[in-house]
Amino acid sequence: MAGRGGLLMLENFIGGKFLPCSSYLDSYDPSTGEVYCHVPNSGKEEIEAAVEAARAAFPGWSSRSPQERSQVLQRLADLLEQSLEELAQAESKDQGKTITLARTMDIPRAVHNFRFFASSILHHTSECTQMDHLGCLHYTVRAPVGIAALISPWNLPLYLLTWKIAPAIAAGNTVIAKPSELTSVTAWMMCRLLEKAGVPPGVVNIVFGTGPRVGEALVSHPEVPLISFTGSQPTAERIMQLSAPHCKKLSLELGGKNPAVIFEDANLAECIPTTVRSSFANQGEICLCTSRIFVQRSIYSEFLKRFVEAARMWKVGIPSDPSADMGALISKAHLEKVRSYIKKARMEGAQILCGEGVDKLNLPPRNQAGYFMLPTVITDVKDESCCMKEEIFGPVTCVVPFDSEEEVIQRANNVKYGLAATVWSGNVGRVHRVAKKLQSGLVWTNCWLIRELNLPFGGMKSSGVGREGAKDSYEFFTEVKTITVKH
Protein backbone atom coordinates (compact mmCIF):
# COMPACT_ATOMS: atom_id res chain seq x y z
CA MET A 1 0.00 0.00 0.00
CA ALA A 2 1.04 3.61 -0.51
CA GLY A 3 2.27 5.39 2.58
CA ARG A 4 3.76 8.71 3.57
CA GLY A 5 4.96 10.72 0.60
CA GLY A 6 3.64 8.09 -1.78
CA LEU A 7 6.28 5.59 -0.61
CA LEU A 8 5.47 1.91 -0.21
CA MET A 9 4.23 1.10 3.30
CA LEU A 10 4.30 -2.55 4.33
CA GLU A 11 1.90 -4.18 6.78
CA ASN A 12 2.16 -7.21 9.01
CA PHE A 13 0.36 -10.36 7.87
CA ILE A 14 -1.37 -12.04 10.81
CA GLY A 15 -4.23 -14.51 10.73
CA GLY A 16 -4.65 -14.15 6.98
CA LYS A 17 -5.04 -10.36 7.13
CA PHE A 18 -2.79 -7.36 6.50
CA LEU A 19 -2.66 -5.26 9.65
CA PRO A 20 -1.14 -1.79 10.10
CA CYS A 21 1.40 -1.03 12.81
CA SER A 22 1.55 1.92 15.19
CA SER A 23 5.12 2.80 14.17
CA TYR A 24 7.32 2.28 11.13
CA LEU A 25 10.97 2.08 10.12
CA ASP A 26 12.55 3.66 7.06
CA SER A 27 13.92 1.22 4.48
CA TYR A 28 16.62 2.43 2.09
CA ASP A 29 17.34 1.73 -1.56
CA PRO A 30 20.97 0.51 -1.43
CA SER A 31 21.69 1.85 -4.91
CA THR A 32 20.79 5.46 -4.04
CA GLY A 33 20.90 5.70 -0.25
CA GLU A 34 17.36 7.12 -0.29
CA VAL A 35 14.34 6.02 1.74
CA TYR A 36 11.95 4.20 -0.55
CA CYS A 37 9.55 2.31 1.74
CA HIS A 38 8.38 1.99 5.33
CA VAL A 39 8.49 -1.25 7.35
CA PRO A 40 6.43 -2.01 10.49
CA ASN A 41 8.34 -1.55 13.73
CA SER A 42 6.50 -4.38 15.47
CA GLY A 43 6.83 -5.55 19.05
CA LYS A 44 5.25 -7.78 21.70
CA GLU A 45 1.68 -6.84 20.82
CA GLU A 46 2.05 -8.03 17.25
CA ILE A 47 3.79 -11.23 18.36
CA GLU A 48 0.95 -12.02 20.75
CA ALA A 49 -1.54 -11.60 17.91
CA ALA A 50 0.55 -13.81 15.64
CA VAL A 51 0.87 -16.52 18.30
CA GLU A 52 -2.88 -16.48 18.81
CA ALA A 53 -3.48 -16.85 15.06
CA ALA A 54 -0.88 -19.61 14.68
CA ARG A 55 -2.24 -21.47 17.70
CA ALA A 56 -5.79 -21.37 16.33
CA ALA A 57 -4.68 -22.60 12.90
CA PHE A 58 -2.52 -25.47 14.14
CA PRO A 59 -5.16 -28.16 14.83
CA GLY A 60 -6.70 -27.89 11.38
CA TRP A 61 -3.47 -27.61 9.41
CA SER A 62 -1.62 -30.35 11.30
CA SER A 63 -4.50 -32.77 10.78
CA ARG A 64 -4.37 -32.42 7.00
CA SER A 65 -2.68 -35.24 5.15
CA PRO A 66 0.79 -34.76 3.65
CA GLN A 67 -0.85 -35.03 0.23
CA GLU A 68 -3.18 -32.10 0.97
CA ARG A 69 -0.38 -29.95 2.32
CA SER A 70 1.78 -30.86 -0.68
CA GLN A 71 -0.89 -29.60 -3.08
CA VAL A 72 -1.01 -26.25 -1.28
CA LEU A 73 2.77 -25.87 -1.52
CA GLN A 74 2.69 -26.72 -5.22
CA ARG A 75 0.04 -24.06 -5.86
CA LEU A 76 2.09 -21.49 -3.97
CA ALA A 77 5.15 -22.39 -6.05
CA ASP A 78 3.12 -21.88 -9.22
CA LEU A 79 1.93 -18.45 -8.06
CA LEU A 80 5.45 -17.36 -7.15
CA GLU A 81 6.70 -18.50 -10.54
CA GLN A 82 3.97 -16.51 -12.28
CA SER A 83 5.17 -13.43 -10.36
CA LEU A 84 8.88 -14.12 -10.96
CA GLU A 85 9.72 -10.90 -12.80
CA GLU A 86 7.84 -8.68 -10.35
CA LEU A 87 9.48 -10.39 -7.39
CA ALA A 88 12.94 -10.26 -8.99
CA GLN A 89 12.71 -6.53 -9.59
CA ALA A 90 11.54 -5.94 -6.03
CA GLU A 91 14.30 -8.13 -4.58
CA SER A 92 16.96 -6.36 -6.63
CA LYS A 93 15.80 -2.91 -5.56
CA ASP A 94 15.32 -3.85 -1.91
CA GLN A 95 18.56 -5.77 -1.38
CA GLY A 96 20.94 -4.18 -3.90
CA LYS A 97 21.70 -7.43 -5.74
CA THR A 98 21.79 -7.44 -9.53
CA ILE A 99 18.55 -8.02 -11.38
CA THR A 100 20.26 -10.88 -13.19
CA LEU A 101 21.00 -12.69 -9.92
CA ALA A 102 17.48 -12.11 -8.63
CA ARG A 103 16.01 -13.46 -11.87
CA THR A 104 18.25 -16.49 -12.21
CA MET A 105 18.96 -17.50 -8.60
CA ASP A 106 16.93 -15.91 -5.80
CA ILE A 107 13.36 -16.13 -7.05
CA PRO A 108 13.72 -19.41 -8.98
CA ARG A 109 15.20 -20.96 -5.84
CA ALA A 110 12.27 -19.65 -3.76
CA VAL A 111 9.91 -21.36 -6.20
CA HIS A 112 11.97 -24.54 -6.06
CA ASN A 113 11.98 -24.56 -2.25
CA PHE A 114 8.19 -25.00 -2.18
CA ARG A 115 8.22 -27.55 -5.00
CA PHE A 116 11.02 -29.53 -3.38
CA PHE A 117 9.39 -29.83 0.04
CA ALA A 118 5.97 -30.40 -1.55
CA SER A 119 7.52 -33.51 -3.06
CA SER A 120 9.80 -34.63 -0.23
CA ILE A 121 6.99 -34.59 2.37
CA LEU A 122 5.37 -37.44 0.43
CA HIS A 123 8.36 -39.75 0.65
CA HIS A 124 9.39 -39.92 4.30
CA THR A 125 9.22 -43.34 5.93
CA SER A 126 9.01 -44.55 9.51
CA GLU A 127 11.16 -47.10 11.33
CA CYS A 128 9.91 -50.48 12.45
CA THR A 129 11.55 -53.37 14.32
CA GLN A 130 10.28 -56.65 15.78
CA MET A 131 11.23 -58.47 18.98
CA ASP A 132 9.79 -61.90 18.27
CA HIS A 133 11.07 -63.43 21.50
CA LEU A 134 9.00 -60.88 23.46
CA GLY A 135 6.12 -60.70 20.99
CA CYS A 136 6.61 -56.97 20.43
CA LEU A 137 6.50 -54.69 17.43
CA HIS A 138 8.15 -51.26 17.65
CA TYR A 139 7.56 -48.44 15.19
CA THR A 140 7.98 -44.69 14.98
CA VAL A 141 5.60 -41.91 14.02
CA ARG A 142 6.38 -38.25 13.47
CA ALA A 143 4.11 -35.32 14.21
CA PRO A 144 4.41 -31.56 13.75
CA VAL A 145 5.68 -29.71 16.80
CA GLY A 146 3.53 -26.58 16.85
CA ILE A 147 4.41 -22.95 16.17
CA ALA A 148 7.77 -22.36 14.50
CA ALA A 149 9.68 -19.07 14.71
CA LEU A 150 11.53 -18.45 11.45
CA ILE A 151 14.08 -15.64 11.33
CA SER A 152 15.74 -15.00 7.98
CA PRO A 153 18.57 -12.65 6.90
CA TRP A 154 18.88 -9.77 4.45
CA ASN A 155 21.32 -11.26 1.94
CA LEU A 156 19.01 -13.77 0.22
CA PRO A 157 15.64 -12.53 1.47
CA LEU A 158 12.93 -14.62 -0.23
CA TYR A 159 15.34 -17.46 -1.04
CA LEU A 160 16.13 -18.18 2.62
CA LEU A 161 12.70 -17.26 4.01
CA THR A 162 11.04 -19.88 1.80
CA TRP A 163 13.81 -22.37 2.66
CA LYS A 164 12.38 -22.23 6.19
CA ILE A 165 8.64 -21.75 5.57
CA ALA A 166 8.33 -24.61 3.06
CA PRO A 167 9.55 -27.50 5.26
CA ALA A 168 7.89 -26.07 8.37
CA ILE A 169 4.38 -25.95 6.92
CA ALA A 170 4.89 -29.08 4.81
CA ALA A 171 5.44 -30.96 8.08
CA GLY A 172 2.19 -29.53 9.49
CA ASN A 173 3.45 -26.71 11.69
CA THR A 174 2.18 -23.15 11.71
CA VAL A 175 4.77 -20.39 11.51
CA ILE A 176 5.61 -16.86 12.56
CA ALA A 177 8.30 -15.47 10.29
CA LYS A 178 10.44 -12.41 10.86
CA PRO A 179 12.36 -11.30 7.78
CA SER A 180 15.16 -8.78 8.13
CA GLU A 181 13.87 -5.24 8.53
CA LEU A 182 16.37 -4.25 5.84
CA THR A 183 14.77 -6.46 3.17
CA SER A 184 11.09 -7.07 3.85
CA VAL A 185 9.37 -6.31 0.54
CA THR A 186 9.31 -9.72 -1.17
CA ALA A 187 8.08 -11.42 2.00
CA TRP A 188 5.21 -8.93 2.08
CA MET A 189 4.52 -9.57 -1.61
CA MET A 190 4.40 -13.33 -1.01
CA CYS A 191 1.72 -12.83 1.64
CA ARG A 192 -0.65 -11.65 -1.09
CA LEU A 193 -0.37 -15.09 -2.71
CA LEU A 194 -1.00 -17.26 0.34
CA GLU A 195 -4.80 -17.18 0.26
CA LYS A 196 -4.85 -17.85 -3.50
CA ALA A 197 -2.67 -20.90 -2.92
CA GLY A 198 -5.06 -22.24 -0.29
CA VAL A 199 -2.95 -21.56 2.79
CA PRO A 200 -5.47 -21.23 5.66
CA PRO A 201 -5.41 -18.05 7.79
CA GLY A 202 -2.90 -18.28 10.61
CA VAL A 203 -0.73 -20.99 9.07
CA VAL A 204 1.80 -18.42 7.83
CA ASN A 205 2.15 -15.18 9.79
CA ILE A 206 4.80 -12.60 8.92
CA VAL A 207 5.72 -9.91 11.42
CA PHE A 208 8.19 -7.20 10.42
CA GLY A 209 10.60 -5.28 12.61
CA THR A 210 13.94 -5.32 14.37
CA GLY A 211 15.60 -8.11 16.31
CA PRO A 212 15.64 -6.38 19.71
CA ARG A 213 11.92 -5.51 19.55
CA VAL A 214 10.05 -8.17 17.63
CA GLY A 215 12.71 -10.88 17.33
CA GLU A 216 13.30 -11.16 21.06
CA ALA A 217 9.56 -11.19 21.76
CA LEU A 218 9.18 -14.04 19.29
CA VAL A 219 12.03 -16.32 20.39
CA SER A 220 11.27 -15.89 24.10
CA HIS A 221 7.55 -16.64 23.77
CA PRO A 222 6.67 -19.76 25.79
CA GLU A 223 4.22 -21.03 23.14
CA VAL A 224 6.84 -21.08 20.36
CA PRO A 225 8.82 -24.34 20.76
CA LEU A 226 10.82 -24.18 17.51
CA ILE A 227 13.31 -21.59 16.27
CA SER A 228 15.05 -21.67 12.90
CA PHE A 229 17.50 -18.80 12.48
CA THR A 230 19.97 -17.75 9.81
CA GLY A 231 22.25 -14.84 10.64
CA SER A 232 25.16 -13.75 12.80
CA GLN A 233 26.79 -15.55 15.70
CA PRO A 234 26.12 -12.77 18.27
CA THR A 235 22.40 -12.86 17.46
CA ALA A 236 22.42 -16.66 17.69
CA GLU A 237 24.00 -16.43 21.14
CA ARG A 238 21.21 -14.09 22.23
CA ILE A 239 18.58 -16.46 20.86
CA MET A 240 20.13 -19.33 22.82
CA GLN A 241 20.04 -17.26 26.02
CA LEU A 242 16.40 -16.26 25.59
CA SER A 243 15.19 -19.71 24.56
CA ALA A 244 17.14 -21.73 27.14
CA PRO A 245 14.54 -21.44 29.95
CA HIS A 246 11.99 -23.10 27.66
CA CYS A 247 14.29 -25.84 26.26
CA LYS A 248 13.37 -24.91 22.71
CA LYS A 249 14.47 -26.79 19.63
CA LEU A 250 17.02 -24.70 17.68
CA SER A 251 18.40 -24.69 14.16
CA LEU A 252 21.12 -22.04 13.75
CA GLU A 253 22.83 -21.36 10.42
CA LEU A 254 25.55 -18.81 11.06
CA GLY A 255 28.60 -17.29 9.41
CA GLY A 256 31.68 -18.58 7.69
CA LYS A 257 35.28 -17.74 6.84
CA ASN A 258 35.41 -20.06 3.90
CA PRO A 259 38.71 -21.22 2.39
CA ALA A 260 39.53 -22.17 -1.17
CA VAL A 261 42.50 -24.53 -1.45
CA ILE A 262 44.08 -24.46 -4.91
CA PHE A 263 46.74 -27.05 -5.69
CA GLU A 264 49.32 -26.76 -8.46
CA ASP A 265 47.51 -29.31 -10.63
CA ALA A 266 44.24 -27.33 -10.60
CA ASN A 267 42.60 -26.43 -13.90
CA LEU A 268 43.03 -22.66 -13.67
CA ALA A 269 40.82 -22.04 -16.69
CA GLU A 270 37.89 -23.30 -14.60
CA CYS A 271 39.23 -22.45 -11.16
CA ILE A 272 39.83 -18.72 -11.64
CA PRO A 273 36.40 -17.63 -12.96
CA THR A 274 34.66 -19.87 -10.44
CA THR A 275 36.74 -18.52 -7.55
CA VAL A 276 36.07 -14.94 -8.65
CA ARG A 277 32.37 -15.78 -8.55
CA SER A 278 32.63 -17.55 -5.20
CA SER A 279 34.42 -14.50 -3.77
CA PHE A 280 32.25 -11.70 -5.14
CA ALA A 281 28.80 -13.06 -6.05
CA ASN A 282 25.99 -11.02 -4.50
CA GLN A 283 28.65 -8.47 -3.45
CA GLY A 284 30.26 -11.17 -1.31
CA GLU A 285 27.12 -11.17 0.83
CA ILE A 286 26.58 -14.93 0.87
CA CYS A 287 27.55 -17.02 3.88
CA LEU A 288 29.16 -19.51 1.46
CA CYS A 289 31.41 -16.97 -0.28
CA THR A 290 35.16 -17.57 -0.41
CA SER A 291 37.15 -15.09 1.68
CA ARG A 292 40.49 -16.94 2.07
CA ILE A 293 42.28 -18.32 -0.98
CA PHE A 294 45.27 -20.60 -0.39
CA VAL A 295 47.31 -21.17 -3.57
CA GLN A 296 50.22 -23.61 -3.87
CA ARG A 297 53.42 -21.60 -4.15
CA SER A 298 54.51 -22.99 -7.54
CA ILE A 299 51.47 -21.40 -9.24
CA TYR A 300 50.89 -18.52 -6.83
CA SER A 301 52.24 -15.71 -9.03
CA GLU A 302 50.41 -16.89 -12.14
CA PHE A 303 47.16 -17.41 -10.24
CA LEU A 304 47.36 -14.01 -8.56
CA LYS A 305 47.96 -12.17 -11.83
CA ARG A 306 45.08 -13.88 -13.61
CA PHE A 307 42.76 -13.68 -10.61
CA VAL A 308 43.23 -9.91 -10.21
CA GLU A 309 42.71 -9.42 -13.95
CA ALA A 310 39.47 -11.41 -13.76
CA ALA A 311 38.28 -9.53 -10.65
CA ARG A 312 38.83 -6.22 -12.41
CA MET A 313 36.64 -7.43 -15.26
CA TRP A 314 33.65 -7.71 -12.95
CA LYS A 315 31.30 -4.82 -13.56
CA VAL A 316 29.93 -2.99 -10.54
CA GLY A 317 26.76 -1.22 -11.59
CA ILE A 318 23.26 -0.24 -10.60
CA PRO A 319 21.21 -3.32 -9.68
CA SER A 320 18.75 -2.84 -12.56
CA ASP A 321 21.57 -3.08 -15.14
CA PRO A 322 21.40 -6.59 -16.67
CA SER A 323 25.10 -6.40 -17.56
CA ALA A 324 26.25 -5.71 -13.98
CA ASP A 325 28.09 -8.48 -12.12
CA MET A 326 27.79 -6.79 -8.73
CA GLY A 327 25.28 -4.35 -7.29
CA ALA A 328 25.22 -2.38 -4.04
CA LEU A 329 25.92 -3.55 -0.50
CA ILE A 330 22.95 -3.69 1.84
CA SER A 331 23.44 -0.52 3.91
CA LYS A 332 25.70 2.40 4.65
CA ALA A 333 26.68 0.89 8.00
CA HIS A 334 27.62 -2.40 6.37
CA LEU A 335 29.63 -0.66 3.64
CA GLU A 336 31.58 1.24 6.29
CA LYS A 337 32.19 -1.99 8.21
CA VAL A 338 33.57 -3.74 5.11
CA ARG A 339 35.76 -0.74 4.27
CA SER A 340 37.13 -0.75 7.82
CA TYR A 341 38.69 -4.16 7.16
CA ILE A 342 40.56 -2.74 4.18
CA LYS A 343 41.95 0.01 6.40
CA LYS A 344 43.00 -2.53 9.03
CA ALA A 345 44.72 -4.64 6.38
CA ARG A 346 46.74 -1.64 5.18
CA MET A 347 47.74 -0.81 8.75
CA GLU A 348 48.99 -4.39 9.17
CA GLY A 349 51.18 -4.08 6.07
CA ALA A 350 49.02 -6.02 3.62
CA GLN A 351 48.82 -5.11 -0.07
CA ILE A 352 45.57 -4.20 -1.83
CA LEU A 353 45.99 -5.34 -5.43
CA CYS A 354 42.67 -4.15 -6.80
CA GLY A 355 39.39 -2.66 -5.73
CA GLU A 356 38.83 -0.36 -2.77
CA GLY A 357 41.25 2.57 -2.75
CA VAL A 358 43.10 1.28 -5.83
CA ASP A 359 40.68 1.41 -8.76
CA LYS A 360 38.07 4.00 -9.63
CA LEU A 361 34.39 3.22 -9.29
CA ASN A 362 32.25 4.84 -11.97
CA LEU A 363 28.59 5.36 -11.14
CA PRO A 364 25.75 7.51 -12.52
CA PRO A 365 25.18 10.80 -10.63
CA ARG A 366 21.97 9.52 -8.99
CA ASN A 367 23.84 6.56 -7.50
CA GLN A 368 26.86 8.39 -6.06
CA ALA A 369 25.41 8.06 -2.55
CA GLY A 370 24.67 4.36 -3.01
CA TYR A 371 26.50 1.64 -1.11
CA PHE A 372 28.83 0.40 -3.84
CA MET A 373 32.29 -1.13 -3.62
CA LEU A 374 34.66 -2.74 -6.11
CA PRO A 375 35.86 -6.37 -5.81
CA THR A 376 38.92 -6.16 -3.57
CA VAL A 377 41.88 -8.55 -3.39
CA ILE A 378 44.31 -8.51 -0.43
CA THR A 379 47.75 -10.17 -0.36
CA ASP A 380 50.77 -10.26 1.97
CA VAL A 381 48.39 -10.83 4.83
CA LYS A 382 49.15 -12.97 7.89
CA ASP A 383 46.91 -15.81 8.99
CA GLU A 384 46.42 -14.02 12.32
CA SER A 385 45.06 -10.89 10.63
CA CYS A 386 41.43 -9.98 11.29
CA CYS A 387 40.90 -10.14 7.53
CA MET A 388 41.84 -13.83 7.66
CA LYS A 389 39.96 -14.60 10.88
CA GLU A 390 36.71 -12.61 10.88
CA GLU A 391 33.71 -12.76 8.57
CA ILE A 392 33.74 -9.59 6.47
CA PHE A 393 30.65 -10.44 4.40
CA GLY A 394 31.56 -8.20 1.49
CA PRO A 395 33.46 -8.23 -1.82
CA VAL A 396 36.83 -8.81 -0.16
CA THR A 397 39.07 -11.86 -0.39
CA CYS A 398 42.62 -12.64 0.75
CA VAL A 399 45.08 -14.63 -1.39
CA VAL A 400 48.06 -16.32 0.27
CA PRO A 401 50.59 -19.03 -0.75
CA PHE A 402 51.13 -22.44 0.82
CA ASP A 403 53.68 -25.22 0.34
CA SER A 404 52.35 -28.58 1.52
CA GLU A 405 49.04 -30.39 1.84
CA GLU A 406 49.42 -30.86 5.60
CA GLU A 407 50.26 -27.18 6.07
CA VAL A 408 47.27 -25.86 4.15
CA ILE A 409 44.80 -28.13 5.93
CA GLN A 410 46.01 -26.83 9.29
CA ARG A 411 45.83 -23.21 8.13
CA ALA A 412 42.44 -23.58 6.49
CA ASN A 413 41.03 -25.05 9.71
CA ASN A 414 42.61 -22.37 11.91
CA VAL A 415 39.46 -20.24 12.32
CA LYS A 416 36.43 -20.52 14.58
CA TYR A 417 34.10 -21.06 11.63
CA GLY A 418 33.47 -24.22 9.63
CA LEU A 419 30.73 -23.64 7.09
CA ALA A 420 32.09 -24.27 3.58
CA ALA A 421 35.30 -24.85 1.64
CA THR A 422 36.41 -25.46 -1.94
CA VAL A 423 39.27 -27.66 -3.13
CA TRP A 424 40.82 -27.45 -6.59
CA SER A 425 42.98 -30.32 -7.83
CA GLY A 426 43.21 -32.81 -10.67
CA ASN A 427 44.24 -35.56 -8.25
CA VAL A 428 41.14 -37.51 -7.22
CA GLY A 429 42.84 -39.11 -4.23
CA ARG A 430 43.99 -35.73 -2.94
CA VAL A 431 40.53 -34.24 -3.41
CA HIS A 432 38.92 -36.92 -1.23
CA ARG A 433 41.72 -36.84 1.33
CA VAL A 434 41.68 -33.06 1.81
CA ALA A 435 37.88 -32.81 1.78
CA LYS A 436 37.68 -35.27 4.68
CA LYS A 437 40.20 -33.32 6.76
CA LEU A 438 38.74 -29.85 6.28
CA GLN A 439 36.56 -28.78 9.20
CA SER A 440 33.65 -27.62 7.06
CA GLY A 441 30.05 -28.74 6.81
CA LEU A 442 30.18 -28.42 3.02
CA VAL A 443 33.15 -29.02 0.75
CA TRP A 444 32.98 -28.39 -3.00
CA THR A 445 35.74 -29.82 -5.15
CA ASN A 446 36.47 -28.30 -8.57
CA CYS A 447 33.17 -26.37 -8.36
CA TRP A 448 31.17 -24.05 -6.11
CA LEU A 449 27.55 -23.70 -5.00
CA ILE A 450 26.21 -26.81 -6.66
CA ARG A 451 23.48 -27.81 -4.20
CA GLU A 452 21.62 -31.07 -3.69
CA LEU A 453 18.70 -30.25 -1.40
CA ASN A 454 18.26 -33.86 -0.31
CA LEU A 455 21.61 -33.73 1.51
CA PRO A 456 22.45 -31.90 4.76
CA PHE A 457 23.31 -28.19 4.71
CA GLY A 458 25.02 -26.57 7.69
CA GLY A 459 28.32 -25.83 9.37
CA MET A 460 30.72 -27.01 12.04
CA LYS A 461 32.15 -25.12 15.01
CA SER A 462 30.80 -21.55 15.28
CA SER A 463 29.07 -21.80 11.92
CA GLY A 464 25.94 -23.23 13.42
CA VAL A 465 23.89 -25.87 15.15
CA GLY A 466 21.96 -28.49 13.20
CA ARG A 467 21.44 -29.14 9.51
CA GLU A 468 18.84 -28.30 6.87
CA GLY A 469 17.72 -30.38 3.89
CA ALA A 470 15.01 -32.89 3.00
CA LYS A 471 15.58 -35.37 5.85
CA ASP A 472 17.17 -32.94 8.32
CA SER A 473 14.50 -30.25 7.98
CA TYR A 474 11.73 -32.84 8.30
CA GLU A 475 13.28 -34.20 11.48
CA PHE A 476 13.73 -30.71 12.90
CA PHE A 477 10.15 -29.63 12.22
CA THR A 478 8.63 -32.82 13.67
CA GLU A 479 8.75 -34.78 16.92
CA VAL A 480 9.37 -38.50 16.78
CA LYS A 481 7.48 -40.98 18.94
CA THR A 482 8.30 -44.66 19.44
CA ILE A 483 5.28 -46.93 19.85
CA THR A 484 5.56 -50.49 21.19
CA VAL A 485 2.75 -52.99 20.64
CA LYS A 486 2.82 -56.35 22.44
CA HIS A 487 0.88 -59.03 20.65
From Swiss-Prot:
The highest taxon in the source lineage is: Eukaryota
Q: What is its EC number?
A: 1.2.1.32
- The UniProt record gives the binding positions of NAD(+) as G231, S232, Q233, P234, T235, A236
Q: Which GO terms describe its molecular function?
A: aminomuconate-semialdehyde dehydrogenase activity; retinal dehydrogenase activity
Has keyword Protease? no
Looking at the UniProt record, the site noted as Transition state stabilizer sits at N155
What positions does UniProt annotate as the active site of this protein? E253, C287
Name its pathway. Answer: Amino-acid degradation; L-kynurenine degradation
Any one of the GO CC terms: cytoplasm
For the keyword Endoplasmic reticulum, the answer is no
Q: Name one GO biological process term.
A: retinal metabolic process
The record's catalysed reaction(s) read: 2-aminomuconate 6-semialdehyde + NAD(+) + H2O = (2Z,4E)-2-aminomuconate + NADH + 2 H(+)
The entry's function note states: Catalyzes the NAD-dependent oxidation of 2-aminomuconic semialdehyde of the kynurenine metabolic pathway in L-tryptophan degradation.
Under PANTHER family, the record lists:
2-AMINOMUCONIC SEMIALDEHYDE DEHYDROGENASE
Q: Which family does it belong to?
A: Belongs to the aldehyde dehydrogenase family.
Q: What is this protein called?
A: 2-aminomuconic semialdehyde dehydrogenase
Originating species: Bos taurus (Bovine)
Query: Its encoding gene is what?
Result: ALDH8A1
